[in-house]
Amino acid sequence: METDTLLLWVLLLWVPGSTGNIVLTQSPASLAVSLGQRATISCRASESVDSYGNSFMHWYQQKPGQPPKLLIYLASNLESGVPARFSGSGSRTDFTLTIDPVEADDAATYYCQQNNEDPWTFGGGTKLEIK
């Protein structure tokens, strides 16, 4: 490989966004919602998680001492057994989890996760408190 070509590849590896992990940023970090009201959680990806006509974004609920539970897969599909109060939407880089109406049992931490690119990555979590 010529020196110029090698140098170009090295520089490309250093350009932010040209390679590396997809970063998922959730907001808010925490929220308190009154019983019966709507909770909305956002997840923004540092690059698109869409491929082959699907959005490879998923949502999980985790309660203390328990493993994460899958709620929504491929952005908007409700996992079997999950109440229809939970819904997901979005595409490319912007996604939303909605819980409407909120019930007392929904108090938990919620995570978005992408598996469009390796390594699979998770958002930082949103802690939901029910008032």
From Swiss-Prot:
Complementarity-determining-3: annotated span: 113-121
Framework-3: annotated segments: 81-112
SUPFAM superfamilies referenced in this protein's UniProt entry, alphabetically: Immunoglobulin
Annotated GO CC locations: immunoglobulin complex
Region annotated Complementarity-determining-1, chain positions: 44-58
InterPro entries (UniProt xref): Ig-like_dom, Ig-like_dom_sf, Ig-like_fold, Ig_sub, Ig_V-set, IgV_Light_Chain
Keywords: Adaptive immunity, Disulfide bond, Immunity, Immunoglobulin, Signal
PROSITE patterns the UniProt entry points to: IG_LIKE (PS50835)
Region Framework-1, annotated ranges: 21-43
Region Complementarity-determining-2: start-end pairs: 74-80
One Pfam family matching this protein: V-set
Cysteine disulfide links: C43-C112
Gene3D superfamilies in the cross-refs: Immunoglobulins (2.60.40.10)
Keyword Disulfide bond among record annotations: yes
Region Framework-2: start-end pairs: 59-73
Any one biological process term the GO annotation gives: immune response
Signal peptide residue numbers: 1-20
Region called Framework-4, residue ranges: 122-131
PANTHER family: IMMUNOGLOBULIN LIGHT CHAIN
Protein name: Ig kappa chain V-III region MOPC 63
